[in-house]
Amino acid sequence: MITYSWRTTLAGAELGDVENLLEQAVEYDAEAGFSTATPAATGGGEVHHLLVSIAPPGERGSVALDRLPDVPVVAYLRLDVRGDVADVQFVVRPEFRSHGVATLLAELLDEQPTGWSSIAGVRRLRAWAHGAHPAAERMAGRFGAHMDHALFKTLRFIGGSRPFVGDEVGAAVEPAPDGPGEMVEGHLAGIAPGERSVLARGRTRLATPVGSVLVGVDEKDPAAQPACVALDPAGVTAGDLRVLLANALLRVQADGARVAQMYVDALSEAFVGASRELGFQHDQSDLLYVRPL
């Protein structure tokens, strides 16, 4: 039913086909915040692109599949290899989901010499599932992957009739042109464009004696768009985290925000506890799966 082929680079019509697939998926997945892929991004290691095709209508072995459009690429996978670990980004064209494409592809990549075994040295796969993706847990269980890490996307409503009230600690205000870094490796590579745009607002650093936090609001309409709050909890006590988060909320609230968005390391008890005490509410979970080959 499906075939696949590896590429070390994408260009011309093939790159256009992949970009079209991703545009369709991003629009379809906008509300859910599912993972996307970045075919043109510069990788930190060896990059492989996998293009998945399907037989033309009338030859797919299923009336339901035969009704779907005749397109050159039905799924795209990017593999970034560093040593014996490969980071996976994978997207199926929306019309072809729930038809077994991902499951069949995973089986073929396991079984065929042109699959995973053709990528020299790879012993583990890492893949982020952004949001409550319906296939992620099922695929992980079927193919022996385990959850290795998790980040919570949280929201804190502020301003208006429900303003945040807290004690402000003196902070030096500094530019942070690079924006927030990755809390866990690989998390930002396949993050949805809408989530990436929120993080991109975090270009102001509030530096205090106990640490620093990045903040920022939408320049055009701060009340309508989520503000960014971002910090790395490593080495910061729960009490100091509360101080930093209170400062951040007071700042973005003063700048006109009505909701603040922040990613929380789910494995940090101090960070989870501090965020809850400050009123941040869980919105979605991003899960990192690891699969040995």
Residue ranges and their predicted role:
Residues M1-A40, P163-E195:
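Short amphipathic alpha-helix that is part of the acyltransferase structural core
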Residues R7-A13, L22-V122, R126, G131, ...:
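Conserved donor-binding loop and adjoining core beta-sheet/short helix segment
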Residues M183-A207, G211-L293:
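Hydrophobic multi-pass inner-membrane translocation pores used for secretion
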Residues V18, L50-V52, V101, T154, ...:
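Generic low-polarity alpha-helical segments
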Residues Y4-R7, P39-E46, H146, G160-S161, ...:
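Short, surface-exposed, charged/polar-biased interaction segments
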Residues R82-V85, F96-G170, L244-Q253, R258-L293:
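Acyl-donor-binding surface of acyltransferase catalytic domains
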